From Swiss-Prot:
It catalyses: glycolate + A = glyoxylate + AH2; (R)-lactate + A = pyruvate + AH2. This is Glycolate oxidase subunit GlcE. Induction: Part of the glcDEFGB operon, which is induced by growth on glycolate, under the positive control of GlcC. Also induced by growth on acetate. Expression of the glc operon is strongly dependent on the integration host factor (IHF) and is repressed by the global respiratory regulator ArcA-P. The lineage of its organism: Bacteria, Pseudomonadati, Pseudomonadota, Gammaproteobacteria, Enterobacterales. It holds the Pfam family FAD_binding_4. It is found in: Cell inner membrane. Its cofactor is FAD. GO terms for cellular component: plasma membrane.
Length: 350
């Protein structure tokens, strides 16, 4: 097992050498999410040695850690203080890291009610494309005007710089949590979800799977109990939400390519080409399909959303419009002028 260690100087030296030699770098943690995006060829920059919790004072509701720190280590520290990561990030592997969580920017079933990974990032330390090790943001939540590089790194898949340290806001764990299951049709489920979203219910999870609506209630004991009586259904183990988050439900073993389709919260039922599982109260559709990539991207775009293929290769991320592509291109050129950070991971031209 790797010890806590500040390995930033060695990482900085390797980056500067790569910039000097114009050698592409493959930024790597535990590889738990390596299946996302296009394969990158280059010299490996392994950040797993750069690990350890730098600062955590539960009274401040902020934790700062080096990027190679295992996510399970972070969550264990938070749990011991009765706190949690509000965005409920997936691991997809026992060694998933703090840095990989932010680089991929994926959130779990609680996302619509608590917020995204980006919403809770307060500050970072980053090795830039100029070969400098700089700090952005801090450990307090504040309004940010202009260029917010810390949050820009969320979901950038390591293409804009090397994260070395991340500060995030955390929240207390709910005092009560209860999961329910109701066997109803998809049409009935979507209708009820739309109605519930107009009410102050302590909902933190809504998923339609296996001909049933799965509901998670979290909050004060009184509000959870009242909502349970109002919504009905049978009480089930809360383990379901972890299995959903980690893609361990039987749905994810079905044949076909797995797609993640993000949609507006009020998106209606959709006739998708394959089997689907509905999460985020309808705003996220997991799809197992053998349809062509272009067809899936087109369906998502026409519904006001975007699709991501959950397997390696070209065409996994939603195609960019010409103006948006130019913006990405300019951003990459400004932050990584030598093109050494995970070139082509998201798009071949970037």
């Amino acid at each position: 097992m790797l010890r806590e260690c500040d390995y930033s100087q060695a990482l900085l030296e390797q980056v500067n050498q790569a910039i000097s030699d114009k050698t592409p770098l493959v930024i790597q943690g535990s590889n738990s999410k390596a299946f996302l995006g296009r394969p990158v060829t280059g010299q490996t920059l392994d950040v797993r040695c750069h690990r350890g919790i730098v600062n955590y004072d539960p009274t401040e509701l902020v934790i700062t850690a080096r990027v190679g720190t295992p996510l399970v280590t972070i969550e264990a520290a938070l749990e011991s203080a009765g706190q949690m990561l509000p965005c409920e990030p997936p691991h997809y592997g026992e060694e998933a890291t703090w840095g990989g969580m932010v680089a991929c920017g994926l959130a779990g079933p609680r996302r619509p009610w608590s917020g995204s990974v980006r919403d809770f990032v307060l500050g970072t330390r980053i090795i830039t494309g100029a070969g400098k090790h700089l700090r952005f943001g801090g450990e307090v939540m504040k309004n940010v005007a202009g260029y917010d590089l810390s949050r820009l790194m969320v979901g950038s898949y390591g293409c804009l710089g090397v994260l070395t340290e991340i500060s995030m806001k955390v929240l207390p764990r709910p005092r009560a949590s209860l999961s329910l299951r109701r066997e109803i049709s998809l049409q009935e489920a979507m209708s009820e979800i739309a109605e519930w979203q107009l009410q102050p219910l302590p909902i933190s999870g809504l998923c339609y799977f296996d001909n049933a609506l799965w509901i998670r209630l979290e909050g004060g004991e009184g509000s959870v109990k009242a909502a349970r009586e109002l919504l009905g259904g049978e009480e089930v183990a809360g383990q379901f939400w972890q299995q959903l988050r980690e893609q361990q439900l039987p749905f994810f073993s079905l044949p076909g390519t797995l797609w993640r389709i993000s949609l507006p919260s009020d998106a209606p039922m959709m006739d998708l080409p394959g089997e689907q599982l509905i999460d985020w109260g309808g705003a996220l559709r997991w799809l197992k399909s053998t349809a062509e990539d272009n067809q899936i991207h087109r369906i998502a775009r026409n519904a006001g959303g975007h699709a991501t293929r959950f397997s390696a290769g070209d065409g996994g991320f939603a195609p960019l419009s010409a103006p948006l592509f130019r913006y990405h291109q300019q951003l990459k050129q400004q932050l990584d002028p030598c093109g050494v950070f995970n070139p082509g991971r998201m798009y071949a031209e970037l």
